[in-house]
Amino acid sequence: QTLGVEPEVLVGICVERSVEMVVGLLGILKAGGAYVPLDPSYPNERLGYMLNDAGVKVLLTQNNLLPELPSHAAQIVCLDTDLKIIESHGQENLMTDVGADNLAYVIYTSGSTGQPKGVAIEHRSVVNFLNYMGYVPGLSQEDTFSAITTISFDIAALELYLPLIVGAKVIVTSHKIATDAN
């Protein structure tokens, strides 16, 4: 919030699959913002287009990815090297005016013209989807999810958040392991 993150403010997140990725996503939502998931394996031109098209104000990333990122106007926060600064902020719950009709995230599709197209997803849509999927097929604290999908694909919200809301376990699988055929 000290960086101006509030409802309808878009925050990019371009990180490798890790626990820090989940912390970053939850931090954006908890601050009241909406995230724009950016796969670090995307071509530089595509990432640049998405950052500019979305008007991303803040970009969460990791220090090792900085050389690969296109130039952009967003303020950068590295979840690894800026950890001390992040930890210096209060640990209390943040107050926000986020409602069901506010944006949760903007995900980019390939687009019918070949240019990526942003699709805005509201909190109500995410919550309704997760609540339904929690009941059918039915999940419990005894279940374990393997999150293998890139965060730039919409099913990632199911893989990451559903286990958390039902008290189950989520294992964030690295890109290397998730794509290994063996």
Predicted regions: what is each one?
Residues 1-127, 131, 135-141, 145, ...:
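Carrier-protein-dependent adenylate-forming modules in NRPS/ANL systems
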Residues 147, 179-182:
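Conserved adenylate-forming
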Residues 159:
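Charged (Asp/Glu and Lys/Arg) segments that form or flank catalytic channels of large polymer-
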Residues 170:
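Short beta-strand element of Class I
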